[in-house]
A protein has these predicted regions:
Chain A
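Short, structured beta-strand/loop micro-motifs enriched in basic residues and often containing a Trp
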Residues: 102, 111-123, 140-143
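N-terminal intrinsically disordered, low-complexity, charge/repeat-rich segments that act as generic
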Residues: 1-101
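Basic/aromatic-rich interaction segments and small domains that mediate binding to polyanionic partners
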Residues: 7-37, 79-82, 121-133, 142-217
């Protein structure tokens, strides 16, 4: 969606917090939020639905909430949507009828779980690849509703395919809970194509783009 | 079950906005309590995740991979060919590295990684991402003015060095292979790994310090 999350190329956000933002966490609650999110709390969601959920936040909150505050809010939305907790239970911070507790995991189990969690997003497509390495392509001037991974700054721009990754899960469909494969490419754009004549002539920006985002140039 | 209904999700977000105190510590506490009471996770498991990523999984893993690439040309070739397969030689495969790509800095090319749409990061090889990587400033500016961003990190690039910014819009993740620092001839892998900074593997650091 054309939401506030689509930050690439937007101006006015000031300097990067290089020193103050060097650590992953500033507060203990951020640490706990991150740890919570490592477990598959809601097995029926997809990674694209999680991302789309963040995009659907109240725009002012998206911009002013800290990163893990956004995650907490998105998980509460997901809990309510999924029926894990009602809105009243969320407000109370407790469920009416607790379930048997989960068994705790050890650090060694987590390290092994991380290793085993190497997910392959390759998903067969039922069509042959339309583009090849070296082809010039043009991005669509618009995204797809409700979810797209074609950022606004790279729309209606011409670039060169520098890699073809076979077919991967299409996020546009993943956000709807569907498992559809589509060919995925890395496309390189010159900085001047994206930002105009003031950009450095040698600089480039690459994006991973699905085939339905592209047309022949 | 998940509805996958955008309108319903947006309605819930608006409800939370209007009815829930924004205090993030309270929201996380509520979320943790709800998850624990539903039997979805044990509190100790959260601690175990934090410990795993503090003690075992972090940028020291990436640094070991880079040091091997500097000293073993065959490994470097494997890393550039298929980084997901290459890091299994260390047992470092895992979360968010199922499609890992290594990109190499040269005297005329600098690589830098960003995720403008969210905050994608190769967790199993670099650990938890720094807060700046997730900041609106970095996400918005890295693609548009990478040289100005690099200058804020203390990296000044001459005009003869081209910058390529990799915007992680899919499930591919990137690790930058920085240039081996001068004066490190004959160093073993452990000593070389100690010269590799986290930021150099994201591409916001460039010239590493040797001796």
């Amino acid at each position: 969606m054309d939401g506030i999350h689509d930050l690439g190329g937007k101006e006015g956000y000031g300097p990067v917090p290089v020193q103050s933002g060097d650590a992953p966490f500033a507060h203990d609650w951020e640490r706990r939020m991150w740890g919570l999110a490592r477990e598959a709390l809601v097995p029926s969601i997809t990674i694209d639905w999680f991302r789309h959920g963040l995009e659907l936040m109240v725009p002012g909150d998206y911009l002013t909430y800290s990163y893990f505050q956004k995650w907490a809010t998105n998980y509460l939305m997901i809990f309510a949507d999924d029926g894990i907790a009602t809105l009243d239970e969320i407000a109370a911070g407790h469920v009416a009828q607790p379930a048997p507790p989960a068994a705790p995991k050890t650090t060694a189990q987590i390290v092994e779980q991380v290793r085993a969690g190497c997910t392959d997003f390759s998903t067969p497509a039922d069509t042959a690849a339309r583009f090849g390495v070296g082809d010039t392509v043009r991005t669509l001037p618009h995204g797809t509703a409700p979810h797209t991974r074609l950022p606004a700054y790279a729309r209606d721009r011409s670039g060169t395919v520098i890699a073809h990754h076979g077919a991967h899960l299409l996020p546009d469909e993943g956000a709807k809970g569907r498992h559809v494969g589509q060919h995925l490419y890395t496309v390189s754009f010159t900085a001047r194509e994206l930002w105009g004549a003031d950009a450095h002539p040698a600089d480039t920006v690459t994006l991973e783009l699905w085939e339905s985002y592209l047309v022949p140039a | 079950m998940t509805s996958f209904d955008s309108k319903k999700a947006a309605d819930i977000h608006r409800h939370l906005h209007s009815h829930l105190p924004p205090d993030p510590a309270l929201r996380v506490k509520a979320l943790e309590s709800l998850a624990v009471e539903r039997g979805l996770i044990a509190p100790e498991t959260i601690d175990a995740w934090v410990e795993a990523y503090s003690e075992h999984i972090g940028p020291m893993r990436g640094a070991k991979v880079i040091a091997r690439a500097w000293t073993d040309p065959d490994f470097k070739a494997r890393l550039l060919e298929n980084a997901t397969a290459a890091i299994t030689e260390f047992g470092f495969e895992g979360n968010a590295t199922g499609h890992l790509h290594a990109v190499e800095n040269t005297p005329t090319q600098h690589n830098m990684v960003v995720c403008t749409l969210c905050s994608c990061y190769p967790f199993s090889i670099l650990g938890m991402s720094p807060a700046w990587y997730k900041s609106a400033a970095y996400r918005s500016r890295a693609v548009r003015e990478p040289r100005a961003v690099l200058a804020e990190f203390g990296v000044t690039l001459p005009d003869t060095v081209a910058v390529r910014v990799w915007d992680s819009t899919a499930e591919l993740r990137y690790i930058v292979i920085p240039e081996r620092p001068p004066g490190t001839e004959g160093w073993d892998e452990d000593r070389l790994a100690a010269t590799v900074t986290r930021n150099s593997m994201i591409g916001t650091d460039r010239v590493l310090k040797g001796a």
